[in-house]
Structures are given as C-alpha cells and as structure tokens.
C-alpha cells in the first residue's frame, strides 16, 4: 500500500485490517474504511463514484484518487463527449429527478427532491448535499430555479 506522508504517520499507529475485500482501521472502537478518509462514501462504487488515476488500487495517495460523484443521488455520465449529471432518489424504487449540465445544480436538485418528499409526508431521513463553495444567496437562487421532473412531482401528488 502507498500513502502520502501525513497518512503514513496515521497508519503507523493503526493496524490496517481487511474483511470481505474492504480495508479498514479500528480507531477509538470504530471501524473506519480507508476510503472514507479520502471523502469516499461507504456505498460508493469504484469507477462510477471514484477511481484510481494510475489504475493501482493499492495507491492511496491523494493525487491518485479522483472522486467522480461526491454528492448523494448524483451520477456523472458521458453524453456526446460532454459530462452530464443524472439525479435520482429512492422512494419505493428509483425516481429520476432530472439530468443537469453541472454538478452543483444537480446536487441542489437532489436536495430539492428531498425537501419535496418530506413535504409529501415521506418520513425517511435522506442525506442532503452540502455545497461548500456557494453562498446562501446563490444556493437559494439556484434552488428556486432548478427544475424537477414532472413524473416525480406527479408521484408525490399520488402519495397525498
């Protein structure tokens, strides 16, 4: 395994264990996956949500890990050589919220879909996306303008 010097210091005082193909450490009684230290979510899939730039799955240097889908409910895909972002939410099956040209707008659309689900009486606690590089004003402006699928809105209406 290869690590940056800062991480090497951390791992020198923690034993790296492996279970069912997942690497983790015990830290204060909690099992923490190695990938979670790099901002990769526990449900992430390699080559869909993150990738190793040089192809070496044992190279955990920050420069070698690219996070493709950093937000909940958002998946990047290629359409005619351009990246697009598909937003889905799971309520008794997957519902497509929409397809967006930029990642930030897609993440906000997911948050809006979660808010609409809660307003429709769905009690499930969905994780929400936090966009660091936006002011509250900019976030609110995008939130009000972002469109959500008509099919999704009709589905929510059918639940009421």
Residue spans for each PLM region:
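Boundary-flanking segments of nucleic-acid-binding domains in nuclear regulatory proteins
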Residues: 1-160
């Amino acid at each position: 395994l290869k690590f940056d010097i800062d991480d090497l210091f951390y791992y020198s005082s923690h034993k790296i264990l492996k279970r069912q193909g997942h690497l983790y450490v015990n830290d204060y009684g909690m099992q923490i996956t190695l990938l979670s230290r790099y901002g990769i979510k526990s449900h992430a899939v390699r080559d869909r949500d993150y990738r190793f730039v040089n192809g070496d799955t044992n190279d955990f240097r920050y420069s070698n890990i690219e996070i493709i889908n950093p937000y909940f409910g958002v998946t990047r895909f290629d359409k005619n050589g351009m990246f697009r972002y598909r937003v889905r939410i799971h309520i008794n099956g997957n519902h497509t919220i929409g397809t967006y040209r930029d990642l930030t707008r897609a993440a906000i659309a997911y948050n809006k879909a979660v808010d609409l689900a809660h307003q429709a009486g769905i009690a499930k606690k969905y994780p929400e996306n936090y966009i660091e590089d936006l002011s509250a004003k900019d976030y609110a402006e995008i939130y009000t303008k972002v469109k959500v699928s008509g099919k999704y809105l009709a589905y929510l209406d059918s639940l009421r």
